[in-house]
């Protein structure tokens, strides 16, 4: 069962649009509209790819704390595949963050 789950997650990530979604969410939670703007995907294409990522256990949807009508997408960081994959397309290799 674990192998099937891992295979499902890797298959979900084997598509450039879905990797772009994961990379965008690596920087923080986004609403579907914000995510569409950031990745340049139409709403119907984005909905399809989010469905695939959600069914693979890589992305979760949560309601806004302040306004229950709005939803946000977040990465399932507890999934080791997300932790190993997310953000690789965000910053060039060797980039560093300095806190002052």
Which residues are covered by each model-predicted region?
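Single-residue recognition of alpha-helix boundary sites
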Residues: 29, 60, 85-87
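Amphipathic alpha-helical interaction segments
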Residues: 18, 56-57, 80, 85
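Short, hydrophobic-biased segments on the C-terminal half of alpha helices
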Residues: 50-51
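Alpha-helical residues within the helix-turn-helix
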Residues: 37, 54-55
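Beta-hairpin "wing" of winged helix-turn-helix
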Residues: 55-71
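N-terminal helix-turn-helix DNA-binding core of bacterial DNA-binding proteins
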Residues: 4-45, 68-80
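Amphipathic alpha-helical dimerization/coiled-coil segments
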Residues: 1-5, 23, 76-100
């Amino acid at each position: 069962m674990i192998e099937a789950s891992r295979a499902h997650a890797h298959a979900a990530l084997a598509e450039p649009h879905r990797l772009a979604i994961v990379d965008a969410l690596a920087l923080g939670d986004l609403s579907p509209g914000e995510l569409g703007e950031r990745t340049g995907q139409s709403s119907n294409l984005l909905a399809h790819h989010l469905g695939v990522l959600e069914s693979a256990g890589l992305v979760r949807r949560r309601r806004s704390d302040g306004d229950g009508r709005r939803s946000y997408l977040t990465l399932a960081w507890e999934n080791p595949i997300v932790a190993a994959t997310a953000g690789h397309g965000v910053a060039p290799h060797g980039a560093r963050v300095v806190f002052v």
